[in-house]
UniProtKB/Swiss-Prot annotation:
A GO biological process held by the record: establishment of tissue polarity
GO molecular function, one term: zinc ion binding
Originating organism: Aedes aegypti
Cited InterPro entries: LIM1_prickle (IPR033725), LIM2_prickle (IPR033726), LIM3_prickle (IPR033727), PET_domain (IPR010442), PET_prickle (IPR033723), Pk/Esn/Tes (IPR047120), Znf_LIM (IPR001781)
Subunit structure: Interacts with dsh; PET and LIM domains interact with dsh DEP domain, in wing cells. Interacts with Vang in photoreceptor cells.
Entry keyword annotation includes Cell membrane: yes
Protein name stated in the entry: Protein prickle
Pfam families attached to this UniProt entry: LIM, PET
């Protein structure tokens, strides 16, 4: 052990050991930004009695150290010269910026003023130390690297037994390297404890708060000293910009606190069980407990429960403040008495202050955190606990609108969703497709955009929610809203602008609805009864297709999305029936309620359409030119004809003619010709201009299939041949005037034809105006035209129309027939009911009668060789755009086989069918 000690002879001839300079353990750099004074400086300046072994430093130089063998290992220091004042417990630490709950506020003076105060602190300490016992020693080591003098008597060097003493010089302590001392591990220990009691005490507190040397707990202790015991709460020299009155106030405030509230806890090992005042749990005997002299003698805490009642942090070095039977750290105890400035972290001693956001500021300190502009009486915005003026806030934190890319100011409304921001205006916060405002409405965010509906998110036009809203169609399709028409005014003209579509429609009601028949001899009351047939229930199940510019959009006529359902066949009121019984026609009945009886010829045509047999368009013997002329003619009022708009006439205006035929029969009773005595060509010639109206209206329907005036309820029963009325067609034809179907006589009805012949019908031309390919196919129809003229002459009938218009009608019919060959609709085969209908006519004794003269084979071709051309292959059922009800393969194949089986008995007759 002597090898570690050197001896020297001083000027008095006395040999004394040479004490080497103190060796210190290396300390890791501290993360705390402020320089902390060493524990040595705390003890030398403030005389904090950290332990019973603490040595008071005398103001005079000590005599030379004695030999280690002559000096005791533990030297007991004399008692303190004076009783420790409250100020002795408050080390003059440097100020720490106030850290609020957000952790972001800072002192506006910490950058310059506090650093200047720190530089003024250490020269004073060094000057004081020059007269101390270690005047010949080097200056104190860097802060944070020196252990506490309370532990100086027991801290050993790494390799020997020489230590430095806290008060009486160094002590040579023979310590085995493996044994270790309990107190050498800590930078601070509670006073008055044995080593085993120190270990027991620190085992009761969290590990990260135990002040081991060079540990996280040591750095935590230093931070808590600055946080819990702010120096500017006690010393005037650490404050800034105080007036003389405020300086006096601070001294009085600090002295009062120390006198009335300051104390230090005492750690003892309990002899009996105690109840912790903090948690209420029992402290067992033998455990360590903390007592406070300013509380009742029996009050005790667990070491981990001796915390501040506000911040819940362990009271650093057991220094506490008492108020109303509660424990406080120095910071929060001062705040219970006076407010603290959120900017400079100092106690506000002035009479006035600014309070905002639940905190207080000096009046001059409540300023913008960025530009230091005072905000007293001004608008400001708090962000992260810091006030900003509006200009600085916009420059630093303003969001940008996703629509216009302009910044959203603090004075402007803002809409935010999922990290996106918009101006709260109708132009910015709007649907990305239709640009309708979404303010105050639910919206659909998708792919970074916002939409008002699912349709808009898919790029489609919005769908109306009910039938009263006009349907939004493509730009070239212009329709008038259904609500714009006055149904109660029969003279009101309503001309919808129906755009063209290349697909004609066939009404599904012709296949689905229950037919109603009424003979021609029935009265008008019976006809009105048939008007209110329950067709709307079936009509609501249909589907309407909107087609414009090859874009097909389908609406279901259920009353929710289709505008057509808003005027679908309301039932006829009884007043309408009784008011019009005395009239020959019911013209004053509103157009949407008027459903006349059908003629037998129309019954047969519609029956063939329902039975999926090709419709005989060749028998429609009128020209479109005549219909167009009548369509544009002036209104000629008649005694029993209502003034209606021809635009309200549907695709089958011959329905209105059949009413007039029946009324002519009732008003002019003459000798009737038998129905079977009239050839089908006579019947076809008896159907005048409305036949061409069928062609033109079907062409119009092929171009506009959205909104037609009325739905097509079918009230005829063509499946009961016994109820077929006997009509004086020949006399009625001769008695009809040329201008019969003028503007005031056409009754609003419609029949829709279904078929897909986009490739054969032009988009903007009617049949009668086509040229080129259509005329090249007219030779066969012209030859048939001559046969029809001969048949008319042999039957003794005279046609009311010139041969030119007659040929032109067949020219258009030929074009229709040729186009119908390519239509998938022509794959539909006749059903059983239509075959039974033909068998019934044959059973009457007229095998070569009119019922087979208008068969599907003769209507389109004169030989059975064209049947294969007429019936397309089965697999092409799915070609093109399908509208309404298309048969699937199984139904189509079944009907195909049934047609082939039923067509053999008539194949020979069909081949030998000659028109003369």
């Amino acid at each position: 052990m002597a090898k570690n000690v050197r001896f020297s002879i001083n000027m008095f001839g006395v040999m004394s050991p040479m004490i080497p300079p103190p060796r210190h353990h290396p300390v890791a750099p501290m993360s705390y930004p402020y320089q902390k004074p060493s524990s040595f400086e705390y003890d030398q300046l403030n005389r904090v009695p950290l332990s019973p072994h603490h040595h008071q430093q005398p103001p005079y130089p000590k005599p030379p150290l004695q030999h280690p063998s002559a000096s005791p290992i533990h030297h007991q220091p004399p008692p303190p010269q004076h009783s420790p004042s409250v100020g002795d417990f408050l080390p003059p630490l440097q100020p720490q910026p106030h850290q609020d709950a957000a952790g972001g506020s800072r002192s506006i003076y910490s950058a310059h003023a506090l650093s200047q105060a720190a530089t003024n602190l250490h020269p004073q300490h060094l000057q004081h130390l020059q007269h101390g016992p270690f005047s010949q020693q080097p200056p104190p080591p860097p802060m944070g690297s020196s252990p506490s003098p309370a532990l100086s008597s027991s801290i050993t060097t790494g390799g020997g037994g020489v230590t430095r003493g806290g008060g009486g010089g160094g002590h040579i302590i023979p310590v085995d390297d493996d044994s270790g001392c309990a107190l050498e591990e800590y930078t601070w220990v509670p006073p008055g404890l044995r080593p085993d009691q120190v270990h027991l005490y620190f085992s009761a507190i969290p590990e990260d708060k135990v002040p081991y040397v060079n540990s996280i707990g040591e750095r935590h202790r230093v931070r808590q000293l600055l946080q819990q015991l702010p120096p500017h709460d006690n010393e005037v020299r650490y404050c800034h910009s105080l007036t003389d009155e405020e300086r006096k106030e601070l001294k009085l405030f600090s002295a009062q606190r120390k006198r009335e509230a300051l104390g230090r806890g005492t750690v003892k090992q309990l002899a009996t069980n105690q109840i912790c005042d903090g948690c209420g749990e029992c402290i067992s005997s033998g455990d360590m407990g903390v007592y406070a002299s300013r509380f009742d003698p029996g009050t005790c805490w667990h070491p981990a429960c001796f915390v501040c009642s506000v911040c819940k942090e362990l009271l650093v070095d057991l220094i506490y403040f008492h108020r109303e039977a509660r424990l406080y750290c120095g910071r929060h105890h001062a705040e219970t008495l006076k407010p603290r400035c959120s900017a400079c972290d100092e106690i506000i001693l002035a009479d006035e202050c600014t309070e905002a956001e639940g905190r207080a500021w000096h009046i001059k300190h409540f300023a913008c955190f960025e530009c230091d502009k005072q905000l007293g009486g001004q608008r400001y915005i708090m962000r992260d606990g810091k006030p900003y003026c509006l200009h600085c806030f916009d420059a630093m934190f303003a969001e940008y609108c996703d629509f216009c890319s302009e910044p959203i100011g603090v004075d402007q409304g803002q809409m935010s969703h999922d990290g996106q921001h918009w101006h709260a205006t109708d132009s910015c916060f709007a649907c990305s497709t239709c640009r309708c405002s979404l303010l105050g409405r639910p919206f659909l965010p998708r792919r970074g955009e916002i939409y008002c509906s699912i349709a808009c998110s898919k790029g489609e036009p919005p769908t109306p929610s009910d039938g009263s809203v006009p349907t939004v169609l493509p730009s070239r399709t212009r329709l008038r809203a259904p609500g714009q028409r006055n149904f109660d005014d029969p003279s009101a003209e309503y001309v919808p602008n129906l755009p063209k579509s290349p697909e004609p429609l066939q009404s599904p009601i012709s296949e689905r609805s229950t037919p109603h028949s009424s003979p021609a001899k029935h009265s008008h009351t019976e006809m009105s009864t048939n008007i209110s047939s329950p067709v709307p229930t079936e009509f609501n199940d249909q589907t309407y297709s909107v087609s414009a510019d090859n874009d097909v959009q389908t609406y279901t006529g259920s009353g929710a999305t289709s505008p057509i359902s808003s005027r679908t066949l309301p039932c006829t009121e009884p007043s309408d029936q009784t008011d019009h019984q005395h009239q020959s026609l019911p013209p004053l009945l509103p157009n949407h309620r008027r459903i006349p009886q059908c003629s037998p010829e129309l019954d047969r045509l519609l029956h063939k359409d329902r039975s999926r047999q090709p419709l005989d368009l060749t028998d429609l013997s009128l020209s479109l030119d005549n219909w167009q002329a009548d369509h544009n003619s002036t209104v000629i009022p008649g005694p029993s004809i209502a003034k209606t708009n021809p635009a309200l006439t549907s695709s089958m205006p011959e329905l209105s003619q059949s009413l007039q035929q029946q009324q002519q029969q009732q008003q002019q009773p003459q000798s009737l010709l038998a129905y079977d005595d009239i050839s089908p060509l006579d019947k076809a010639s008896a159907i005048t201009d409305p036949d061409d109206a069928i062609q033109n209206a079907s062409d119009d329907a092929s171009h506009s299939i959205v909104e037609l005036p009325t739905p097509p309820p079918i009230v005829s029963n063509t499946r009961d041949p016994e109820n077929l009325p006997k009509m004086p067609l020949r006399r009625f034809q001769n008695s009809l005037p040329r201008n019969k179907f003028h503007k005031s006589s056409i009754i609003k009805k419609e029949v829709r034809f279904e078929g897909i012949f986009q490739d054969s019908l032009p988009r903007s031309k009617s049949y009668c105006t086509r040229s080129g390919g259509s005329r090249s196919r007219s030779s066969k129809s012209k030859r048939r035209s001559s046969h029809h003229h001969q048949h008319h002459r042999s039957s003794g009938e005279s046609s009311s129309y010139s041969g030119t218009s007659y040929d032109r009608h067949h020219h258009s019919s030929s074009g229709s027939s040729s186009s119908n060959r390519r239509s998938p609709r022509r794959r539909r085969v006749p059903d059983v009911e239509f075959i039974e209908h033909q068998d019934h006519h044959r059973g009457d004794g007229d095998d070569d009668s009119d019922s087979r003269s208008v068969c599907s084979t003769c209507s389109s071709s004169s030989s059975s060789a064209d049947d294969t051309v007429y019936e397309l292959p089965m697999r092409r059922t799915y070609g093109g755009t399908r509208i309404h009800y298309m048969p699937n393969n199984s139904l189509a194949c079944a009907r195909k086989r049934k047609q082939l089986q039923n067509s053999h008995p008539y194949e020979k007759d069909n081949k030998n069918c000659i028109i003369s």
